[in-house]
Amino acid sequence: MRKNPLVLGVSASVETNVGRIAQIIGPVLDVSFPPGNMPNIYNSLIVKGQGTAGQEIQVTCEVQQLLGNHKVRAVAMSATDGLTRGMRVIDTGAPLSVPVGGATLGRIFNVLGEPVDNLGPVDAGITSPIHRPAPAFTELDTKLSIFETGIKVVDLLAPYRRGGKIGLFGGAGVGKTVLIMELINNIAKAHGGVSVFGGVGERTREGNDLYMEMKESGVIDEQKISESKVALVYGQMNEPPGARMRVGLTALTMAEYFRDVNEQDVLLFIDNIFRFVQAGSEVSALLGRMPSAVGYQPTLSTEMGSLQERITSTKKGSITSIQAVYVPADDLTDPAPATTFAHSDATTVLSRGLAAKGIYPAVDPLDSTSTMLQPWIVGEEHYETAQGVKQTLQRYKELQDIIAIPGLDELSEEDRLIVARARKIERFLSQPFFVAEVFTGSPGKYVGLMETIRGFQMILSGELDGLIEQSFYLVGNIDEATAKAINSSMES
């Protein structure tokens, strides 16, 4: 932690070590330095000069390789348009540092920690380097407690751990960003602490939507910006790979300060962690490394581990991280999602099949898992209900082939009852979201854990066998489903 260095983490002793650009290949620069003055790996370099059109240029880069012959190879954090060979490059003598603390709340930053929301400069007295070691084993906290989300399928079948890492896995267009926005809506509002959102390589429109949503809900207070509850850090799809690779670390550094110095419980949302891997793959290729499986960087596990191991709970405070993970071609065995799986305490897997049926959130109840779903953590009642739901859905899945060809009539009475209950459960796992009210036309619903357990117990026990399955679709608690069934029977 450093007090009052210049913006962008440039050390106060500027221009003590100056090099020259020797080669430019897209976002990668080779820089020559005087003998004996080589910058360290991860040092921040600043290119200053005038472009061909006379415009002022200032590009920040990060040292990635020491090449020999007094040259280093660095990756640019912004566009390299207008750079030419021979331009002066200043070694700042330290890694990239970003503003941290209360001054970051309510503001939007880029990877360099510069505000990009047109609300003026950030008055941050303290900056922190984005590269730092993970907390030591002796500092870690191992308390186990559930993080209630108000989303039925999550709370019942794959509950989240307070201070844990949660992965939202899904292919393109199955609802990852909507789910993460609903979690922000449900948790960040109810959660008294602060949140940090890292937009890593996703759509700029979604970043803008989220900002507007937070202003409307009061999570960001424009009138009293210091009373806001969230800091936003964006490195979107149009940014160079260097920015997309490091923006997750910028967001994490801000979250770590709230945990370690302010001793708060922090929520860290990352959308999308796959883009972090993808940017690392692009940078790896540009640096000339031999690709590994499916074209990914050979350092995939190391890069992922260095980010994920910093996201943890210590004796001072906790970081609960919720990360959207894009699954290429819906293949969960792809190295990027497979590597992320290893770090997750809970995995929420989104299914294209359920999305096609119109069941939202399209969370696969059989593929989604959680280390918290143990009777000694969640209690016997919760555990037994969750297992009953999974067994019913698993049996329904096994019977699909028989239903598809000979039909329901070929099933035994017991199996027909299981199918009917499974279809009710499947529909009852859907839920109207607050952030999707404009699409569904239904007001959003927050369902408490005890209400969720009671509803599924009633379906499993057979109390609601007489109700039509459609009455369970897109409702909150079980009382709404029974009221909907009574209304539809009266209308018919």
From Swiss-Prot:
A single BP term in Gene Ontology: proton motive force-driven mitochondrial ATP synthesis
Name of the protein: ATP synthase subunit beta, chloroplastic
Cited function: Produces ATP from ADP in the presence of a proton gradient across the membrane. The catalytic sites are hosted primarily by the beta subunits.
Location(s), subcellular: Plastid, Chloroplast thylakoid membrane
Binding annotation for ATP: G170, G171, A172, G173, V174, G175, K176, T177
Keyword Translocase: yes
Self-association and partners: F-type ATPases have 2 components, CF(1) - the catalytic core - and CF(0) - the membrane proton channel. CF(1) has five subunits: alpha(3), beta(3), gamma(1), delta(1), epsilon(1). CF(0) has four main subunits: a(1), b(1), b'(1) and c(9-12).
Chief location of this protein within or outside the cell: plastid
Gene Ontology MF terms in the entry: ATP binding; ATP hydrolysis activity; proton-transporting ATP synthase activity, rotational mechanism
Family note: Belongs to the ATPase alpha/beta chains family.
Organism the protein comes from: Pinus thunbergii
One GO CC term, this protein: chloroplast thylakoid membrane
Classification via InterPro entries: AAA+_ATPase, ATP-synt_VA_C, ATP_synth_F1_bsu, ATPase_a/bsu_AS, ATPase_alpha/beta_chains, ATPase_F1/V1/A1_a/bsu_N, ATPase_F1/V1/A1_a/bsu_N_sf, ATPase_F1/V1/A1_a/bsu_nucl-bd
PROSITE patterns in UniProt: ATPASE_ALPHA_BETA (PS00152)
Pfam families registered for this protein in UniProt: ATP-synt_ab (PF00006), ATP-synt_ab_N (PF02874), ATP-synt_VA_C (PF22919)
